[in-house]
């Protein structure tokens, strides 16, 4: 049996998640927590399926699309460690530097 993978969130990814929650809460406060729960549940699936995201735009990363939401979780897999680098809206202009 494989070792349990560990997921960690970069500080900027945690801030991204907070910003997503705040933005959704502007129009639909009740939907904001549901959206965060959906994102976090999808990220937890990476423990079992670390390659489920497509190859990322940045070398060495993968991108997990969170459906039905339009958010993309950028992450890296290093052995049994999965680092969540960013959480971005699919339609937003991505920052010049992801990592």
Language model regions located:
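Arg/Lys-rich, positively charged N-terminal/basic patches that mediate binding to nucleic acids
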Residues: 1-34, 99
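Generic structural signal for secondary-structure transition and capping sites
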Residues: 22, 29, 44, 48-51, ...
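Basic/aromatic recognition patch in beta-strand/loop cores that engages polyanionic ligands
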Residues: 41, 48-81
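Enriched for short, Lys/Arg-rich terminal
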Residues: 71-99
């Amino acid at each position: 049996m494989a070792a349990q993978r560990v997921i960690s969130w970069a500080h900027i990814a945690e801030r991204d998640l907070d910003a997503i929650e705040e933005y959704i809460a502007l129009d639909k406060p009740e939907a904001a927590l549901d959206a965060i729960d959906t994102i976090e549940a999808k990220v937890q699936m990476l423990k079992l399926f670390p390659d489920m995201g497509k190859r990322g735009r940045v070398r060495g990363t993968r991108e997990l699309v969170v459906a039905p939401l339009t958010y993309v979780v950028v992450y890296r897999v290093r052995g049994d460690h999965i680092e969540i680098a960013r959480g971005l809206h699919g339609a937003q202009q991505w920052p010049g530097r992801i990592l």
